[in-house]
Each structure stands twice: as C-alpha cells, then as structure tokens.
A protein has these predicted regions:
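C-terminal motif of bacterial Sec signal peptides marking the signal peptidase cleavage site
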Residues: 2-3
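Short, conserved catalytic or interaction motifs in soluble domains
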Residues: 6
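Right-handed parallel beta-helix/beta-spiral solenoid domain characteristic of secreted/periplasmic
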Residues: 9-26, 60-103
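Glycine-rich repeat segments that build the extracellular carbohydrate-interaction surface of secreted
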Residues: 19-23, 31-50, 62-66
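Solvent-exposed, polar/charged alpha-helical surfaces in well-ordered, non-transmembrane soluble domains
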Residues: 26-33, 118-119, 194
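Extracellular beta-strand/beta-solenoid scaffold signature
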Residues: 28, 50-51, 77-85, 101-108, ...
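Right-handed parallel beta-helix
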Residues: 38, 64-70, 91-101, 113-126, ...
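Phosphate/pyrophosphate-binding loops and the adjoining catalytic core of nucleotide-dependent enzymes
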Residues: 54
Length: 225
C-alpha cells in the first residue's frame, strides 16, 4: 500500500530493564528535605546512580524499597558527602533496599531514638579493599535500635557497627568480608543473636574505648555463627 514504507515499526520494549529517571537523585533528596512526620518514601525497584550523599533530619519517616536486591542505591560515582545516607532523626525506619559502594560509611544514623533497620544490604561490590568505606550499617549515640535481617559486605572497618548506644538488638543478619563483622562499642544493653558473621578478620567484637561519652555494659551474644 502507498505510504506503508514510510511508517516506523513499533518499538520493542524490554520489560526486564528498569528505566530510571535522570533526575531521580534530585527528587529523592527533595523528598527527604520536605518530608513530614509519618511520611513513607517508597523507592521502586531499580538501580539508581547517586553522586552526592543523602541526608534526613525529619522525625517519623520511613524509607522503603522493593527488596534489598531490587532497589539499589549505587554511590559508585559519588563525588561529595561523607556517607551514602546520613540520618539524624527519631522514629526512623529503613527497609528493603541496598546501599552500594558509598564513598564513606554506607548508612550512618546519629543521635536518634527508635530506629528500625530491616532487610537492608550495604556492600562494596569490588570486594574487600582498604579504600572501601569504613562502616556499612553504623548507628551511633542511638537509643532503642533494631537491626534485623540486614546484610553487610566489604566494609574496610566494620560491617555492622553500633557505638555509644542504648537498648540495641542485632538479629537474623549476615556480615561477610569486613574487617570486623559485627562490632558493639561503648553500648548498654545490646542483644546480638541469630547472626552469621563469617569471612571477616574478626567475627563479633564487644569492647569499650576510653575517653568516649559512655562506657558500655550488659551485652549478650548468643546463637551466632
């Protein structure tokens, strides 16, 4: 038929490929800055390249992905920021996502109360390296913190590090190929159980460092591998 040769064939869409908007990073940081207590920030499945560290300082926010192997925040080309994600807020939950290849610490939570870190993976994908960030999951000076079903791989210091905190549970988690798998430092009332800490220089460490804001006590460690 006349004119048929000029028509373009319909595009073939590969549904297995995630299409990520170019301005995702700007949108996500804006959501974090403008969040209100009670907000849930949902991040769909996909691998998202981020170039600057993220931060949250609003209480009562949940960040939720589609799964630790489905929603991936990749900081491989990070050019600014000391962490992948820095949180200085109370009543915070993060779950079902991964933070990869952060320039510094992957997930740092500082001076926060009532924190849940669940089904989060932190990883440096190039394998063990002294140039990797120091800490994977890093709550410091927190109170009432649950770390559950997380995975921490490849930190140049500790995969899961809890410092100067009170009332902490670390359970059902896996730490591999870090210098220290799980480290509890200067912390009161921590329970560490049902975890796997293998292929690290040290598996699970508990100690007090001098000249810090508090000395720790009453850490219980049981049923770990």
């Amino acid at each position: 038929l006349a004119g048929c040769a000029d028509q373009e064939a319909p595009a073939v869409v590969d549904e297995s490929v995630s299409v990520v908007e170019v301005d995702f990073e700007t949108q996500l940081q804006l959501q974090l800055l403008e969040a209100k207590p009670g907000d849930v920030i949902d991040i769909p499945a996909g691998t998202y390249a981020l170039y600057r560290g993220l931060s949250l300082s609003v209480d009562g926010v949940t960040i939720r992905g589609a799964g630790m192997d489905k929603t991936i925040l990749s900081f491989k080309e990070q050019v600014s920021g000391a962490e992948g994600l820095l949180v200085t807020a109370n009543d915070f939950t993060i779950e079902d996502l991964a933070i990869e290849d952060a320039k510094g610490d992957a997930l740092k939570i500082n001076e926060s109360k009532n924190v849940i870190i669940r089904r989060v993976r932190t990883e440096w994908t190039n394998g063990p390296d002294t140039a990797n960030g120091a800490y994977g999951i890093y709550p410091v000076q927190t109170e009432n913190t649950l770390i559950d079903e997380v995975v921490a791989i490849g930190a140049s210091d500790a995969g899961i590090y809890v410092g100067q905190s009170k009332n902490v549970v670390v359970r059902n988690s896996r730490a591999e190929y870090n210098v220290a798998g799980i480290e509890i430092e200067n912390t009161f009332d921590a329970d560490v159980f049902d975890n796997v800490a293998i292929n690290n220089t040290g598996g699970i460490l508990v100690f007090n460092m001098p000249n810090l804001s508090q000395e720790g006590a009453r850490t219980r460690i049981f049923r770990n591998l």
